Design a protein with these regions (language model features):
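A short beta-strand element within beta-rich, extracytoplasmic domains
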Residues: 416-440
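Active-site-adjacent loop/helix surface patches within enzyme catalytic domains
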Residues: 194-319, 409-411, 423, 439, ...
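Glycan-recognition and processing domains
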Residues: 369-415
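Short beta-strand-plus-loop segments that form exposed binding edges in beta-rich domains
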Residues: 487-497
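Basic/polar, cationic surfaces and motifs that engage anionic cell-wall
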Residues: 156-203, 291-373, 508
Length: 508
């Protein structure tokens, strides 16, 4: 059924400042993105400002050619998303075909013609919402989530709705989206930190990478720079999809603020380069955007990515030069769809390599001058103590930090805490992390205690989740000394086993 948008898109949501091309007549108006979205909004009952926000997240309101992201197996950029509305066709998803069926337009028209693409996107979104359309913008959140392959996409769209957006397209059309009062759910409030402390862990589909135990001393010697050819959230969602069996990357950097998501552990091999010898010894970093649209290359993204590359270069002893920090184009051969030379140009001619490498070098010098980190495992000699109440357990050794853990069968009414001895070389601010193997019979309200310069403080964690990774416990001011200052409490208001496995401190 037809359903008029609640808000007049052309009046309240978008201001068209300049017409397309040199003429300002009817032909120019017919080709404006604002008009195309207005018509699609009216035809399918989808709020126009929602279409506009989605288009901004997808492509910054550009219409990339189909070749920009045609599906290719083993290629993290070739996810098969098309047009300003990022309609998808790959082995696990086909919103492009769905759009064709709903609108009666051919797949080729939707891939190549912007108005058809906008119409197809609106039709799919309306179909996902069901016959009874939501009565406000917040009500469309679930449909947007399903459209984009997960809640991360919806969150990115709704952040744009809340903040507003403005841009001039390559055709000269100026579009402005006014801020809206919408609710942006806080996703993953207890999300695990990635291997890189400034990243967030999102995970992978399980069949799109190679499990390994690469050693920092010798197994990683290259960093490969990529472009997503799509939005940040679409890349993260694709890498996390259980139906994706072909491609992944270790990290993905967001354009707007430099936020970093991790999809594959550094110790494992991501399928990002399309050339096994490169994959085997490299870390792949994706960057949100398109190779031919330099507006995506923000200062925030450059600086955040350079900080990450500097961290990796120091950690893995990677030389900071263009032989070891390379573009996807430099990867040898085209053995698969994801190969480099002759197959890819990313990050493309607009990527400022001089700026990027200078930032990496500057940050690496700072890291080398200020880096301090200590990891203490429950098996570290002279640095862990616990009463006989804590049993040595070799359960879940594949996701414990070391060969075992200490387990308290049930919380006690008295303090018999397990304690880790931590050395801090100078008074200052330190990040503290905990590690444990998770299990459903573990305690959901385990208490960590950290001794700061102001006394003992507590942090409660759920040990039923987030196992086998470093979990951020907070940043604290610690005194200069070497003492038992991080504990796992023997007391807990919850039920279940309490685990003491490993802790880590890092200078902030």
């Amino acid at each position: 059924m037809r359903y008029r948008a609640l808000v007049l898109f052309s009046v309240l949501s978008v201001l068209v400042v300049s017409a397309v091309g040199s003429g300002a007549g009817a032909d120019a108006r017919q080709t404006s993105l604002a008009d195309e979205m207005d018509r699609a909004s009216g035809e399918y009952g989808v709020p126009g400002e929602l279409l506009l926000a989605m288009g901004y997240v997808n492509t910054r309101w550009e219409m990339p050619p189909p070749s920009a992201s045609d599906y290719k197996a083993d290629d993290p950029e070739g996810r098969g998303n098309y047009g300003v509305m990022a309609l998808v066709r790959n082995p696990s998803e086909d919103t492009l075909g769905r759009a064709s069926a709903l609108t009666g337009e051919s797949v080729e028209a939707i891939k190549n013609d912007r108005a058809s693409n906008v119409r197809g996107g609106a039709a799919v979104l309306a179909d996902l919402a069901g016959e009874e359309k939501p009565r406000d913008l917040d009500g469309w959140y679930d449909a947007v989530s399903r459209y984009g392959g997960g809640e991360l996409y919806a969150q990115q769209v709704y952040e744009v709705l809340r903040e507003g957006a403005a841009a001039t397209t390559s055709t000269g059309e100026r579009l402005e989206l006014a801020p809206r009062e919408v609710e942006v759910p806080a996703l993953y409030s207890a999300q695990a930190t990635g291997d890189y402390p400034r990243s967030r862990w999102y995970g992978n589909g399980g069949r799109n990478y190679t499990e390994s135990r690469r050693e920092p001393t010798s197994d990683v010697n290259t960093i490969v720079i990529h472009m997503t050819q799509g939005s940040w959230s679409s890349a993260i969602n694709y890498f996390a999809s259980s139906s994706n069996e072909s491609a992944s990357a270790h990290y993905t950097v967001r354009s707007s603020d430099g936020f970093i998501g991790q999809s594959v552990r550094e110790s494992d091999i991501a399928w990002h380069a399309g050339w096994w010898p490169t994959n085997k010894h490299s870390i792949g970093i994706e960057h949100e955007g398109y190779v031919d649209q330099p507006r995506w290359f923000t200062d925030a993204m450059y600086r955040s990515s350079a900080r990450l590359s500097a961290y990796l270069a120091v950690k893995y002893h990677i030389p900071i030069d263009r032989k070891h920090i390379i573009e996807h184009k430099q990867v040898p051969g085209c053995s698969t769809g994801g190969g480099g030379v002759g197959c890819h140009t990313d990050p493309g001619r607009y990527w400022n390599w001089r700026k990027y490498m200078d930032l990496v070098k500057d940050r690496a010098r700072t890291i080398r001058n200020n880096t301090y980190q200590q990891v203490v495992d429950n098996a570290t000699p002279g640095r862990f103590k616990a009463s006989d109440h804590w049993n040595v357990s070799r359960r879940h050794t594949t996701i414990s930090y070391g060969p075992n853990q200490r387990v308290l069968p049930r919380p006690l009414s008295v303090s018999r805490n397990a304690a880790f001895k931590i050395r801090t070389p100078a008074r200052g601010s330190y990040r503290v992390y905990g590690w444990w193997p998770a299990d459903r019979d573990y305690n959901a309200r385990t208490m960590f205690r950290i001794k700061t310069t102001g006394g003992w403080t507590r942090r409660t964690v759920n040990q039923q989740i987030n196992g086998g990774r470093w979990i951020y416990l907070g940043t604290y001011n610690l005194a200069e000394n070497d003492s038992y200052r991080v504990e796992v409490s023997s007391k807990s208001p919850g039920r279940g086993r309490v685990v003491a496995d490993a802790v880590k401190v890092m200078r902030s």
